[in-house]
From Swiss-Prot:
This is Protein E8^E2C. One of its GO terms (biological process) is regulation of DNA replication. Residues 1-45, 68-87, 94-119 are annotated as: Disordered. It comes from the Viruses. Signal peptide: none annotated. Transmembrane segments: none annotated. Its main location: host cell. One of its GO terms (molecular function) is DNA-binding transcription factor activity. It comes from Bovine papillomavirus type 1.
Length: 215
């Protein structure tokens, strides 16, 4: 059996020739072995894959730069211009921009003013043939409590009842007199039934009258 030991390629032999040491069967040292396949032929082999070019090779001279710069460019590919751009905006364009800034955004919602309700729902406090009333007065707390009890327990004994109201004075929101409510009845007999079954708390006053429409 013949055993040959290969050493790394000599840098002075670019042709890929390997130098073998003395073998076990007495081969003299320094004997040239069979030339190895150059690395350049293996680069395109699909079985070997990519191999670093220049492995064991010596590059002659400096590597050329992949980009060629013109003389006096200082090695820069892009040169920035420091000259400012000067110009004037046309008058019509400036006025148009000013109008756009002043014009409101069309997407903004404008407040919608709803018309006041004027539909006649058929309710009238006074009837054409005359109406019977009971005017009840007292402190604000008394009148509110009385109206609450009447509406809750005696709703079938009258027709309509107003909210608590005051008579205004001459200056601003000044009030004069006591708080009052107005209760309407369909007939004098209904008002008598109301006065009979609905007691009036102490400190409150009641007055009855009949009113008719003049127009």
């Amino acid at each position: 059996m013949k055993l040959t030991v290969f050493l790394r390629p000599s840098r002075d032999r670019p042709d890929g020739v390997w130098v073998a040491s003395e073998g076990p069967e007495g081969d003299p040292a320094g004997k040239e072995a069979e030339p190895a396949q150059p690395v350049s032929s293996l680069l395109g082999s699909p079985a070997c894959g990519p191999i670093r070019a220049g492995l064991g090779w010596v590059r002659d001279g400096p590597r050329s730069h992949p980009y060629n710069f013109p003389a006096g460019s200082g090695g820069s590919i892009l040169r920035s211009s420091s000259t400012p751009v000067q110009g004037t905006v046309p008058v019509d364009l400036a006025s148009r921009q000013e109008e756009e800034e002043q014009s409101p955004d069309s997407t903004e919602e404008e407040p919608v003013t709803l018309p006041r309700r004027t539909t006649n729902d058929g309710f009238h406090l006074l009837k054409a043939g005359g109406s019977c009333f009971a005017l009840i007065s007292g402190t604000a707390n008394q009148v509110k409590c009385y109206r609450f009890r009447v509406k809750k327990n005696h709703r079938h004994r009258y027709e309509n009842c107003t909210t608590t109201w005051f008579t205004v004075a001459d200056n601003g929101a000044e009030r004069q007199g006591q708080a009052q409510i107005l209760i309407t009845f369909g007939s004098p007999s209904q008002r008598q039934d109301f006065l009979k079954h609905v007691p009036l708390p102490p400190g409150m006053n009641i007055s009855g009258f009949t009113a008719s429409l003049d127009f």
